[in-house]
């Protein structure tokens, strides 16, 4: 893994690990109602990652705001696209200029050793193999499909440390998928978002564990 040179990050920063897609600066997060169950159902992976992103017309865009409710966190930055993580539908929605682009995703049930990018157990490796199998299968029928590996953390810790850790974990998953399972590098990108998009900004420890997550988002 190549070294990450990180000195200072602004509030809405990210670490680009591999092949960057467009970067959002606003977020709406719909929190899950249940705790993630391991291992990930192969049917869920197949359904989500075989569904291509789509563009729809935004009929009503909420006014820019910053607020927190029991299930939703809204952080808007004027002049920037709004990004929505909807865990009920498992889609990332990017809203800009009257259009909404929906990108299906799966949350990987992978665990890492505390404070590191090293995979913790065999279940994590099995989950990555399941994802690799689906991506390879989809690539045969849709050669242009592309997926982004997103690393996220909880709000616990410093922004700089969380940014570096999320980038390292996204890169770790990227390396396993490309090197161990043969996913073409042209089909993947990787980003670390740190604590930019928490599901539970003021959550307890159990909730913050769900924020320490890695997503595979179909971007094309």
Model-derived features: positions:
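Short, solvent-exposed beta-strand/turn patches at coil↔beta or beta↔helix junctions
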Residues: 83, 89-137, 154-160
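Short coil/turn motifs at beta-sheet boundaries
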Residues: 103, 142, 207-209
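Periplasmic OmpA/Pal-like peptidoglycan-binding modules at the C-termini of bacterial envelope proteins
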Residues: 14-56, 171, 175-220
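Alpha-helix N-capping/helix-start residues
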Residues: 121-122, 167, 185
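N-terminal targeting leaders that direct proteins to extracytoplasmic destinations
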Residues: 1-102
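A broad, structural micro-motif
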Residues: 102-104, 165, 183
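Short, surface-exposed beta-strand segments enriched in small/polar/acidic residues
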Residues: 106-115, 134-169, 188-200
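Periplasmic peptidoglycan-binding/anchoring modules of Gram-negative envelope and division proteins
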Residues: 116-150, 174-179, 216-220
